[in-house]
């Protein structure tokens, strides 16, 4: 597997193991139709590999070391009532951030992991709440093995 794929797999593994402050009921890399989720599948997230920037770091006569800065997009959904949907969205965001901060090297595959953007549906999906978290990961690899 490539380092980028190993990082994506690490994010799935970490998110699947979360139990506090909330337990994620559905964690996948495949987008899903939120209207098809049962009550028992909330909160649910999917993770997608996003854009990446690559630059050469070092070159020798036999290899090139590159740095990749890749974005991974986490899209999540919670379900609540009129009095707690914003709280549930915030709990989901906090859960994701806490889990990712537990190992910013993504199992040794990355130099650093940062959450660079958080956005919400701002109530447009009520009674479902949606969030989007952009996770930026910096890593190095040998050219030909991203």
Identify the role of each PLM range.
Residues 1-42, 46-146:
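Charged, amphipathic alpha-helical segments and their flanking helix caps
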């Amino acid at each position: 597997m490539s380092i980028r794929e190993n990082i994506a797999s690490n994010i799935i593994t970490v998110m699947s193991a979360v139990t506090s402050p909330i337990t994620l009921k559905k964690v996948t890399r495949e987008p899903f139709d939120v209207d098809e989720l049962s009550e028992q599948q909330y909160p649910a997230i999917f993770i997608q590999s996003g854009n990446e920037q690559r630059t050469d770091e070092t070159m020798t006569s036999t290899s090139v070391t590159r740095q990749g800065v890749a974005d991974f997009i986490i899209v999540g959904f919670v379900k609540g009532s009129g009095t707690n949907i914003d709280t549930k969205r915030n709990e989901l965001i906090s859960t994701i951030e806490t889990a990712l901060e537990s190992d910013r090297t993504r199992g040794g595959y990355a130099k650093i992991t940062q959450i660079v953007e958080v956005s919400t549906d701002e109530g447009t999906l009520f009674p479902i709440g949606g969030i989007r978290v952009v996770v930026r990961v910096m890593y190095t690899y040998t050219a030909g093995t991203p």
